[in-house]
UniProtKB/Swiss-Prot annotation:
<dbReference type="GO" id="GO:0003735">
    <property type="term" value="F:structural constituent of ribosome"/>
</dbReference>
<dbReference type="GO" id="GO:0019843">
    <property type="term" value="F:rRNA binding"/>
</dbReference>
<dbReference type="InterPro" id="IPR001912">
    <property type="entry name" value="Ribosomal_uS4_N"/>
</dbReference>
<comment type="subunit">
    <text>Part of the 30S ribosomal subunit. Contacts protein S5. The interaction surface between S4 and S5 is involved in control of translational fidelity.</text>
</comment>
<dbReference type="GO" id="GO:0042274">
    <property type="term" value="P:ribosomal small subunit biogenesis"/>
</dbReference>
<dbReference type="GO" id="GO:0015935">
    <property type="term" value="C:small ribosomal subunit"/>
</dbReference>
<keyword id="KW-0687">Ribonucleoprotein</keyword>
<dbReference type="InterPro" id="IPR022801">
    <property type="entry name" value="Ribosomal_uS4"/>
</dbReference>
<comment type="function">
    <text>One of the primary rRNA binding proteins, it binds directly to 16S rRNA where it nucleates assembly of the body of the 30S subunit.</text>
</comment>
<dbReference type="GO" id="GO:0006412">
    <property type="term" value="P:translation"/>
</dbReference>
<dbReference type="InterPro" id="IPR005709">
    <property type="entry name" value="Ribosomal_uS4_bac-type"/>
</dbReference>
<dbReference type="InterPro" id="IPR002942">
    <property type="entry name" value="S4_RNA-bd"/>
</dbReference>
<protein>
    <recommendedName>
        <fullName>Small ribosomal subunit protein uS4</fullName>
    </recommendedName>
</protein>
<keyword id="KW-0694">RNA-binding</keyword>
<comment type="function">
    <text>With S5 and S12 plays an important role in translational accuracy.</text>
</comment>
<feature type="domain" description="S4 RNA-binding">
    <location>
        <begin position="93"/>
        <end position="173"/>
    </location>
</feature>
<dbReference type="Pfam" id="PF01479">
    <property type="entry name" value="S4"/>
</dbReference>
Length: 203
């Protein structure tokens, strides 16, 4: 699947959210949109622009392109419950996201690379599809030849236990994690309003 190849830092500044550790540091120094008039842009933002911005936040945060994001939305609509909540839950179940949440990678982008390069298994079987949706009880583990990679060990050492969510059980020493449950919406702390995305797609 094609991936975004532009500047994540510029996108982060435009959307006002940190999409990577590097972007987070950059935003601390330059917390405004890129470009000559980034600091002085003012004026009322239209409802459509707000909805579009929230969709962009979700897409870039989870590393999902438009066609797949729309597919998640259609699936969320078909499920019982609140569509926006369902959408967030689907994105949180992605393999690359759970790898990131487990502390095995410093960003979702880095987690995606670990997955696509075949470093991880699910229930003992190699899975290299970032969009694979985990179900409760599934075990994520590094393949034997991939254990103790420097980047992974460094990320685990830097990841405080408080950052690892309650719906994932992580064994740092053995570099494995169990996806315990699908998180409730209120357990997912991300800077977006998915209801605006639902309104956008509902038009």
């Amino acid at each position: 699947m094609a991936r975004f190849r532009g500047s994540i830092t510029k996108v982060s500044r435009r959307l006002g959210i940190a999409l990577s550790p590097k972007a987070e540091k950059y935003l601390e120094r330059r917390p405004f949109a890129p470009g000559q008039h980034g600091q002085s842009r003012k004026g009322k933002i239209s409802e459509y622009a707000l909805q579009l911005r929230e969709k962009q936040k979700m897409k870039y945060l989870y590393g999902v392109l438009e066609n797949q994001f729309r597919s998640y939305y259609r699936k969320a609509v078909s499920q019982r419950g609140v569509t926006g909540d369902n959408l967030v839950k689907l994105l949180e179940r992605r393999f690359d996201n759970v790898v990131f949440r487990s502390g095995f990678a410093a960003s979702r982008s880095a987690a995606r690379q670990l997955v696509t390069h075949g470093h991880l298994t699910i229930n003992g079987k190699k899975v290299n599809i970032p969009s694979y949706l985990l179900t409760p009880g599934e075990l994520i583990e590094f393949r034997q030849k991939s254990k103790n990679m420097g980047a992974v060990t460094d990320s685990l050492n830097k990841a405080p236990d408080a950052r690892i969510p309650s719906w994932i059980q992580v064994d740092k020493a053995n570099q494995k994690a169990v996806f315990l449950s699908v998180p409730e919406r209120e357990e997912v702390q991300e800077p977006f309003n998915e209801q605006l995305v639902v309104e956008l797609y509902s038009k």
